[in-house]
Amino acid sequence: MPVVDYTARPPSEGEQMDQHYRAAWDGLTAPGAPFAWSVTDVRGVPTRTYDAAPPNLALLWAGSVAHGDADYLVYQDERMSYAEAHAQVDALASHLAAIGVGHGDRVALAMRNYPEWVLGYWATLKLGAAVVGLNAWWTGPEMEFGLADSSPRALLCDGERLDGVVPYLEALRADGPMHVVGVRLDPDAGLPVDAVRWEDAVTGAADLPVAPMADIGPEDDLCIFYTSGTTGHPKGAVLTHRGAASNLLNLAFWQTMAGAAQDMAVAAGEPPTGSDKQSGESYPGSVLAVPLFHVTGCNCCLHPVTAVGGRLTLMHRWNPEVALELIERERPSTFTGVPTMVRELINSPDFDRRDTSSLAHLGGGGAAVQPDLVQKIEERIEGRPSTGYGLTEVNGVISINANQFFMAKPASAGSPCPVMETRIVGEDGTDQPTGGHGELWVRGGNVFRGYLNRPEANAESLTDGWFHTGDIGYLDEDGFLFLVDRAKDMVLRSGENVYCAEVEAAIYQHPAIAEAAAFAVPDERHGEVVGVAVVLLPDADLAADALRDHTRALISGFKVPEHVWFLDDPLPRNANGKFVKRTLRDQLVGTPAR
């Protein structure tokens, strides 16, 4: 990390926290410390890895048996303890082993956020097989693609997904057997050949030998998650046990380091603003509002909640009022959702009527967190705002920003985690200096193996272990990462790059805005200009020119939206909660704007 000299003048509060932050960081990563790391050869590349990382994630699940009767999974009016979950995982693993699933095989999961997704995940890992997390929003043909691409030995899916897959099963099985376990099927629903209901698979396992835990190495495949691309077929990112274990320790490191830095500041008589904020009584765990078939839901929520013996409350679908009801009832310490969900939660008319005092952290990842949202979180809950920047291809997070650090630099994605090397690479392929903009490249123990069956994509995105994120950003003098935008989410206006995230951040500072998405609109004179789709808060009133005046006061004139569409319905999103700008462009460009 860069060294900053504060001896020439008294340090500000932010600089004081920075000194404690660096001291805590250095102490926790020193040789022999809990988060010490070494350089290891991983796939022929020198790679930073944590010394204390577990060799596989199946050990994490095995250790959770110690939590016994504590609540593990909550879904609507259903509750399942750790002991009950272990019994079902063992039974399902025995069933899968009996039909031939073993080390190196794959098991696909295709369902909503049901408890069975979690149980199927751990049962698959116990056998040394890899999970294929299929997008539950996919259509039948998209499911066919994912199954053909990944060739799973078994498919665990709910009734809605099964109906979409059945027409393709015979063709898919031409290349090999694919056993089906149906989840939460209607009692009178039929079953295809070589299929069984979940409850029959679990109860029938009583007559089968108990499947032992496989011998699993760090570089064995853990899961395949498909990236949420907006063009062409999605790509299956192959994640390893080493990568997921590294991500788990990245999350634990930041929480430990931030707490240690605050304790140092208080002990030095320099308590930072907000350090006296205390959440109410809570239980370790989270209300999960994002899908389990993405790394935010699985690697960044399911894994750490399980590691601490916490309670995971699953939502069938996103609804801010239901989420607030669950937070009040279950009293989780965290809420896991993308920033648009956090904004809807705070804007909900139910927010002030519900008890959210249990939340120690309210934040999310998957998209940029606008500075105005950071301030709203700080003002409206007892917990602290937090965010993480990451990608499917890195098993979760690259950097984290939370607590006082977030308030000091709310526009930053945080400091890259200890095992993450970073480069900012310009268009000419050279590394950029501090403050210079370029594409972020990362290398570390949590970087994925590559894309399944995509050698050309791997050649384009991986260079000597460095993953090209496709995100444009820069590092400041303190080593904090700032994201400017996606490399392909820009407007090129008369040769000037306009980053959509900057436009959106300015628009969101207007109090009438509920949702906003900026995108490129073709223009004969400028090549491209900025267009924006906007949804207003209930009972709000805003004219397009007033929005432009507001935006012009915050950003350069050439970045101000020339086309404004006010929409009554929520903006379209993909399964991970991100706005689908391609859909917006297709729907709006060419229609009257204001």
Label every PLM stretch briefly.
Residues 245-289, 293-333, 348:
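Conserved AMP-binding/adenylation subdomain of ANL enzymes
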Residues 203-226, 233, 277-285:
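Conserved pre-ATP/AMP-binding loop-to-beta segment of ANL
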Residues 138, 144-145, 155-157, 444, ...:
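AMP-binding/adenylate-forming catalytic core of the ANL superfamily
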Residues 81-83, 222-254, 258-265:
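Conserved AMP-binding A3 loop
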Residues 2-32, 98-99, 129-204, 538-540:
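Structural core segment of the AMP-binding/adenylate-forming
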Residues 52-53, 69-114, 118-122, 139-144:
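Conserved AMP-binding/adenylate-forming core of the ANL superfamily
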Residues 307-310, 329-337, 346-408, 421:
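Gly/Ser/Thr-rich phosphate-binding loop
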Residues 389, 409, 421-441, 474-478, ...:
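Conserved beta-loop-beta connector loops within the AMP-binding
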